[in-house]
């Protein structure tokens, strides 16, 4: 049965200054573009609404394969780039308690970004609890409810829990951020995302509490009265025969070694010692399929001194798992440049943008350390013009 949100009548989020975004959608801010002479990668020093409109007008519609953005969270804080004893202002999040102004800002940007993404592309929007749910409704409208893939929960990292100093609390400590993942097309498929996670082989009970009568059959003289066996009868009988062959002819070597010698695709079932239930063998694993709870890595890093620097492991996972070599990756709130550095390392093309001089300077330095030289001062062709943004 189709979701109600997939019908012609859409659910929309309305706010106090609804439609204000239309008044700012065409604003032309000063822009500066830094371009690599060989790869064509672009770094914009400008307001990102100007940059995405420039890309639309210069042939990038439907060309970007993966977008990761980390917009302000609506905390109302000032952020810095801290090096030794020097603090350089990076940006100020002015949206605390100003939900309508935040929505006026983010809506037109997401609307244009949606046009830039390729048919098989995706967007990942990194937020926290302050404005996550408002942005989710907006993205359902712009990208389509049916194109929502996951909310990814990511561990913040080394953030101290300050609640220990109080005798009572009014809320729990927040230890996670969230990333909203949308695809451009509902039919797009991805390979299983795998992460390293070494697990030894083990025997486990073959019975499951899922109640399917058609999966109840006799094994070792026993038929379950409720629940079911995990596999079909034919598959289970073959696994029993496999184990009999191993015990009869190869018991002098460990079962795991025998499994490796037989192309690592044999399955085994045996009668559990001392009880009537069968058990099946789970082979060792070096990788497991990733789910949406990412507690094995951290969202933030502290290598550059930039307050909101994202961890390279986070971007390696997103870019490595959900894009291909030579794909075009973009980050329109690029901050310290982690997305661009990782994209460069993984063999992707990239586009970055930030309005902060501090962020652009830091990004340039990081890219230079990634064997990437930038040609500065190029101005865009067409009607956009202007000098450097301070």
Feature map (PLM): residue ranges:
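Conserved SAM-binding loop of SAM-dependent methyltransferases across substrates and taxa
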Residues: 338-348
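Class I SAM-dependent methyltransferase "Motif I" SAM/SAH-binding loop
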Residues: 333-337
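Conserved SAM-binding motif I beta-strand of class I
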Residues: 350-354
